[in-house]
Amino acid sequence: MQVTMRGISKAFGPVKVLENVEFTLRGGEIHALMGENGAGKSTLMKILSGVHRADAGEILLDGRKAELRSTEAAEAAGIAIIHQELNLIPQLSVMENLFLGREPSRFGIIDYAAMRREARAQLEALGAGGIDPDAEAGSLSIGQQQMVEIAKALALNARVLIMDEPTAALTEREIDRLFELMAQLRENGAAIVYVSHRMEEIFRVCDRISVLRDGCFVGEREIARTDFDEVVRMMVGREIGDRYPKREAAPGEVRLKVENLADENMIAGIGFEVRAGEVLGIAGLMGSGRSDILKTLFGAKRRTAGRVELDGKELKVAAPGDAIAAGLGFVPEDRKSKGLVLGMSLRENATLVHLDQYARLGVVSAAEEKRAVDGLIAQLRIRARDAELDVKSLSGGNQQKVVFAKWLANPPKVLLLDEPTRGVDVGGKAEIYHIVNQLAAAGTAIVMVSSELPEVLALSNRILVLHEGRQAGIFDAAGCSQETLMAAATGGAVHSETRKQA
C-alpha cells in the first residue's frame, strides 16, 4: 500500500502542532520519522491511524482519498499502530488484550482455547514465548508489555504498520528479533513507519527518513545518502556539539558504599562504591536486576541483606522518604506512573520533593515556587508556555526534564537514574547528558541504569554488569567495549584486563 499525506495541519486549542505537513510511504519499505520531542511525529501518526482528525489536508491510500475518522476505520483500511505509551488493560490477561474486540468464538461463545493457542503463536513469532497468555497484563514488566503491544499490532495483519518507539523497553535480543520480523514484513510488501530517537537503529533498519521540526516538514532523505550529522541538523536546526560531552573533573571521596546487597526476589551479593563526582553505569539484560538495585537503595523495594553507607555512615532506608531525607534522589524508569503526578502542573511537580523550601509558617508560597521553577525551565530548556501548564500536556522529553527538575532545585548527594533518556530525542539527550555532567561536577555521585550501551560507555567512569540478579563484574569504561559488556551480561567469559572488583 502507498500512503500519501498532503497539507496536514492540526492544532490543539491555540497551539499549532502540525502545519502543512507532507509525508509519503511506499509498500515494501521501512520509513523513519524523526524530530525532536514536540515536533509533531506522534500527532501525525495518530492522524494516520485514526486517533486524531486533521484540521486540514488529505490522506490518500493507493491514490484514493481516505476518511480515517476512527481507529476502527484505520484498521479496516489496513493501518495499525504500536503506541509509544503502553495501551494495554492491566486487569485483562495477555490473550484478552491481544484479541480485544475480535475474540475468536464458537456458537456465539468466546473460544478461550483457540484464543490461547493464537496468542501463544503470536508471542512465539516475536521470540516472546516465555510470556504466559493467561498472565494479567499488569503483572508483566514494561519490556514484556511492549512485546504484547507489538504482537497485538502484528496480529491485525496490517498493510501499514506504525511503530512509535517500539524498542524503548526491549532487550538487545528482543530488538534483534523485532528487526528480523520487520525485514520479513518488508519483503512481504508491508509499509512500516518507524518512529525512534535511537539513531543507530534508524541507520540499521530503515530505507528512508523524513524529519519534522516544530510541526513542519523539513525534508526527506534516502538512508544510504545521509549521515548522523545531517539528520541531527535537520532535526534541531543547529549543531549540538559533541554527542557525548566529556567530563573533566576527577572523582572525589567515596560517597556511597554498598556491600552484599539483596532484595526479596531478584538481586543478591551486590557490592560497589561510587565516589563524589563519579558516574557508575549499570548494564545487563532486561530482568537481570538493574532497576531492582536502584529501587532497593531508594526504599521502593525491601532490602533483605547487606549494608549501605553514605559518606562513611550506615544508611538505613525503610521507605523513599528516608532516602530523600538522607540525600538520595531517583529518576524512575516509568516517568508517567512513578516520576510525575500527571494531574498537577509543571510547577507543582518540580517542587514536590522539597516543598518545605517554599513554605512560610506551613503555607506553600506559589510565588516562591514559580520563581524557582522559571529558573529551572530556562536551565533545562523545557518547552512549555509557563510553569502552570499541566505536565501531562508536555512531550515525553520535556516531561523527563521535569522529573530531573525535582532534584536540581536541591541537588542530592546521590542520584539514581533509571533509563534517564528513554523516549528522549537526540537534542534532549545531549541536554540530559549535560545535566548529568553538571551534577557530577558539583559532587553528586550518580548511579545510572541504561539499556543503550553506547550511552553507558560514554557517560560512566565504571560499569557494573549484572547477570540474572548477580554481579558479573565491574569494568573501567575507558578500556571497555559493547561486546565485553554483552558477554558479561549473558554469562559469557570476558577479558580480565577490563574487569575490576568493586
Swiss-Prot record:
It catalyses: D-ribose(out) + ATP + H2O = D-ribose(in) + ADP + phosphate + H(+). Pfam families: ABC_tran. Keywords: ATP-binding, Cell inner membrane, Cell membrane, Membrane, Nucleotide-binding, Repeat, Sugar transport, Translocase, Transport. It is a peripheral membrane protein. It comes from the Bacteria. Its EC number is 7.5.2.7. GO terms for molecular function: ABC-type D-ribose transporter activity; ATP binding; ATP hydrolysis activity. GO terms for cellular component: plasma membrane. Gene3D superfamilies: P-loop containing nucleotide triphosphate hydrolases. ATP binds at G35, E36, N37, G38, A39, G40, K41, S42. CDD domains: ABC_Carb_Monos_I (cd03216), ABC_Carb_Monos_II (cd03215). It is found in: Cell inner membrane. SMART domains: AAA. Residues 3-239, 249-493 form the ABC transporter domain. Belongs to the ABC transporter superfamily. Ribose importer (TC 3.A.1.2.1) family. The complex is composed of an ATP-binding protein (RbsA), two transmembrane proteins (RbsC) and a solute-binding protein (RbsB). Part of the ABC transporter complex RbsABC involved in ribose import. Responsible for energy coupling to the transport system. This is Ribose import ATP-binding protein RbsA. The lineage of its organism: Bacteria, Pseudomonadati, Pseudomonadota, Betaproteobacteria, Neisseriales.
